Amino acid sequence: MKKMRWTAMAMAAAMVLSSGAAIPAMAEEAVGGNEEVLTSEPHKIRTIITTDGEIDDQCSLVRYMLYANMFELEGLVSSSSKFHYTTKEGEVFKGKTENQKWIDAYAQVYENLCKHADGFPDPEYLTSINVEGNVTAPGEMGTDTPGSLLIKKCIMDEREDMLFLQVWGGANTIAAALRSIEEEYKGTDQWEEVYKKVCDKIVLWNDLDQDNTVNDYILPHWPDVKVIMSYDQFWAIGYPWSSTTPEVYHKYYDEEFMTKYIANDANSLSQIYYNNLTSMGGEGEHPIRFLSEGDTPNFFYILDNGLRSWENPSYGGWAGRFNKVNCADDAWNIGSEERDPMATSGQMLSGYWNEASDDGDRYKPIWRWADDFQNEFAARMKWCTEEYENANHEPVVQVEEGIDLTAKRGETVTLTAKTYDPDGDQVSVAFWQYGDADTYGGDVELTAGEGDQVSFTVPEDAKTGDTIHIIVEAQDDDEETPITRYQRVIVTVGAETEQ
């Protein structure tokens, strides 16, 4: 069931609902109702984007630029795929040059973006990390290139935090970096330490498996590297979105929405985005409808919007949700098609892979958030041209009791949300159980309390170690493009105390 948002002040405090429906809080005060001003700095994850320049990559790159303040980008690397490469007959593969067009468009709105949020990277810095990778053929990984060497340098530096490698095309430039590391260190007394360093540090998101390097090289040679295999779910925001997303959400992708909020001749990023929307139709006029952003889930996964999706692929968020493959500790997938065998940790993977579905729908883990991420896309697009006071900005939400809690069977858990909106908007709060992300297999009853508060009792049939995920949503009341922020509270069932 889709989460529901109801008018908070109309609800009775004693209302009880089960999993699947949202409990709205009884907020009675504007601007979140807090005397103190809450603040929230984004948790920025290090990342490198590799792209083959497909038109939907280009659309994703525009959206990425609007969120560039939320990440620590270390490289923008051109890479080939089985669809695009320099030696393909009839192909004009522009690579680094094409990426620079997007950086130049970003540069034109950079100063205005900085009026709305701190942390947007300088365009000159982006130009300095825009490099060519392995682009000559699908799966070519035998050559050291500026892109592969940049990736290798980031992997081998002294930092220990996660390095998230985004594969928008083929994984071959990343494979070339790993091949170079293996050639340099394997057979030396440093190899065991280097191998562990690499496997502990990097997480690789592989979109559509667009060359053979993950199957043929990365997993057999680096079986402990964490890999997220994304095959199907991203179609909820990809080319076939109209058939994978329920009709109720089509209004966030259709011509009216895109024309009103995205197409803006005064906005250089907007221009380059909607030019792609119309270019696919050939000659003549074409509707400005959403086209495809199949690679956007790459960075949605590490976007700090409060859903904590990067902590564990099974949690779910704007990027979708993933099941663990039993025979490979660190391979996560959402695909349902039969794949070639992959060697990992000495075992082979083949056949139908488990797909993470919400309510039995394999696309729902993304489309359930469509209104939220499309509204924020529209709001951030406005940041490119408007002054701060004429645009909408995200609210802040925190949970007073914390976001990682332990409770015993039969114990009552109370959650109190505190909110703030930088624009002075009213903020509505809703609570709901994300049952698909739980390891506890049942529903909990949520009871609305006073103010922005909800409570529930841990069921008696819950097992020690089971987790219950409660999503706390805070949405401002902007009339056109409301923005939503979240907190995910994970309640772990604790062991009973022996008498």
State each model region's role:
Residues S19-A30:
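Sec-dependent signal peptide cleavage junction
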Residues I490-E496:
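Short beta-strand edge segments in extracellular beta-sheet folds
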Residues E28-E445, Q453, T457, D461, ...:
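N-terminal acidic, glycine/proline-rich low-complexity segments
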Residues P482-V489:
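Extracellular and select intracellular beta-sandwich modules with Ser/Thr-enriched
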Residues M1-A10:
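Bacterial N-terminal signal peptides that target proteins for export
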Residues M11, M15-S19:
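Hydrophobic core
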Residues Q475-P482:
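Short, solvent-exposed loop/turn segments at the edges of extracellular beta-sandwich modules
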